[in-house]
């Protein structure tokens, strides 16, 4: 049975997954975060390398910046959201998600177990993305894919949809945003957008399947990272300064940074053409000292 919600009262969110074939012919999966306003159909999608909790938080924050914060979000029983239910059926929230709800000021409602159709609006959105946005889609980097995704959202939100009998942008601006909260910038928000990472023994952090270098003079064990478009920024653990930045090429090769290992030192260069030349020979064969033994016969070579 179809139900209705007041403007700005309820959004629905979910993950979808799509298989990507790269230039070498191998395949991997990317996750599509989807959120939709149940009242007007305003929608937002974003792609991530995986559906980990840190990417759920980033996707939700970007969606709230795009369409405001509702009274509650309806979702299914994700591991990132809920641990289990108690004897009375009340949800026991995952501790980081519960803190996230408190910091941003919204509530979460869960579908009944094995009843995903309760959030039919976002289920249809995920299916629509797979049927409308993705077929024939070619991209070079996930950053490009997300730029195309937000343009697609802007287009879809600006045209009439019979299911909600309105143009989502118009109704959302006129009615939903009067009740939805505007997401304000805060230090807590920046922490969610910049996940924490441990620094490896060889001076790298691992993010989105790639390794990025950290300057050697930063001596703490953790830092924070944020991908903004085509640039990855690495911050200190307290978000007080940028340690370094990397161009995000999505290559599997390690990305080194300046001052990752040693400090650059002054070096003298020839000021005139070098005319003197000497010769270097190949080193003599290495004699390990065991060549006089005949190990196969157990005898000395004499």
Predicted regions and their residues:
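Acidic/histidine-rich, metal-coordinating catalytic segments
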Residues: 69-89
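Active-site-proximal acidic segments at structured loop/helix or strand boundaries
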Residues: 126-226
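RNase H-like two-metal-ion nuclease catalytic core shared by retroviral integrases
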Residues: 75-76, 87-88, 108-130, 145
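Active-site beta-loop-alpha junctions of metal-dependent nucleic acid enzymes
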Residues: 45-70, 249-255
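Mobile-element integrase/transposase regions
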Residues: 1-43, 51-55, 102, 190-207
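Protein C-terminal end segments and domain termini
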Residues: 229-302
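Two-metal-ion acidic nuclease core segments, chiefly of the RNase H-like superfamily
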Residues: 90-108
């Amino acid at each position: 049975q179809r139900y209705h919600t007041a403007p700005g009262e309820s959004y629905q969110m979910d993950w979808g997954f799509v298989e990507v074939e790269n230039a070498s012919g191998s395949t991997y999966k990317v996750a599509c975060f989807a959120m939709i306003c149940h009242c007007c159909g305003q929608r937002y999608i974003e792609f991530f390398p995986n559906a980990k909790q840190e990417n759920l938080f980033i996707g939700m924050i970007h969606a709230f910046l795009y369409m405001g914060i509702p009274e509650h979000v309806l979702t299914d029983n994700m591991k990132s959201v809920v641990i289990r239910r108690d004897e009375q059926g009340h949800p026991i929230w995952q501790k980081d998600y519960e803190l996230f709800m408190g910091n941003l000021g919204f509530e979460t409602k869960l579908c009944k177990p094995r009843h995903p159709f309760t959030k039919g609006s976002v289920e249809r959105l995920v299916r629509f993305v797979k049927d409308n946005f993705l077929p024939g889609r070619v991209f070079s980097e996930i950053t490009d894919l997300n730029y195309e995704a937000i343009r697609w959202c802007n287009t879809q939100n600006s045209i009439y949809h019979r299911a909600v009998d309105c143009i989502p942008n118009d109704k959302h601006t006129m009615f939903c945003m009067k009740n939805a909260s505007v997401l304000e910038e805060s230090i807590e928000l920046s922490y969610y957008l910049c996940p924490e990472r441990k620094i490896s023994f060889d001076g790298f952090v691992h993010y989105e399947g790639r390794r990025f270098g950290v300057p050697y003079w930063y001596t703490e064990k953790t830092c924070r990272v944020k991908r903004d478009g085509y640039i990855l920024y690495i911050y200190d653990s307290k978000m007080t300064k940028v340690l370094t930045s990397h161009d995000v090429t999505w290559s599997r090769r390690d990305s080194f940074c300046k001052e990752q290992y040693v400090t650059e030192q002054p070096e003298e260069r020839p000021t005139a053409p070098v005319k003197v030349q000497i010769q270097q020979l190949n080193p003599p064969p290495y004699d390990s000292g065991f060549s006089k033994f005949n190990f196969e016969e157990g005898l000395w070579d004499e």
